[in-house]
Design a protein with these regions (language model features):
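Internal alpha/beta core interface subdomains
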Residues: 1-22
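Outer-membrane beta-barrel pore domains
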Residues: 15-187
Length: 187
């Protein structure tokens, strides 16, 4: 089951504020694989019908005219590997982001510089065995949208902490930096 409700308000300044709430409830069947435990290996068990996966999130968007703020925070329960590594169970999670942006449009060249902090503490359900994941990152970026059909973005990210969930034992990256580029075609 999935539901979302949001409502935009036009403020006296002409700027728009949109508030929303969304949530879902269902079951998720995570993939599992053997992990090394004490000289042997164990494949974590999970319910055949899947693990309870439910969340509620709150959203607020103050659309940039020229300054804007966007945030979303979610709370819930989802698949996560147990502390002893023998089963995938439903455990609490939380996370979200806060983004500040600015719309600058000079000579038909719209630029959107932004700063975004993102945080997550919970199971990573799409990774094998749904291990616990911590994410705490800060992004600095610039989006260029000269044409409505094409958006180009460059982002510098600083990772305060991010759990590496691809290989057991699940370690943590701290103090990492990366640069990303994205081209998005809108049709």
């Amino acid at each position: 089951m999935l539901a979302r409700a949001s409502y935009p308000f036009k403020l006296s300044s002409g700027q728009f504020l949109e508030l929303g709430v969304q949530g879902y409830h269902g079951r998720f069947v995570p993939q599992t694989q053997a992990i090394p435990v004490g000289g042997g290996s164990v494949t974590p068990s999970r319910p055949d019908e899947g693990v309870v996966d439910e969340r509620v999130a709150f959203t607020a968007v103050w659309y940039p005219q020229p300054f804007g703020v966007e945030t979303e925070w979610n709370l819930g329960r989802g698949p996560e590997l147990s502390d002893d590594g023998t089963r995938v169970e439903s455990r609490s999670l939380q996370g979200g982001y806060l983004q500040f942006n600015y719309r600058q449009a000079k000579a038909g060249m719209p630029l959107f510089p932004f700063v975004r902090w993102q945080y997550y503490d919970g199971g990573r359900k799409f990774a094998r065995n749904a291990p616990h994941s911590n994410v705490n990152e800060m992004d600095f970026g610039l989006e260029f949208a000269r044409w409505s059909e094409l958006e180009l973005t460059v982002v510098y990210s600083h990772t305060f902490e991010r759990t590496r969930t691809s290989v057991f034992p699940y370690g943590s990256a701290k103090g990492a930096n990366r640069v990303g580029f994205q081209a998005q075609w809108n049709y």
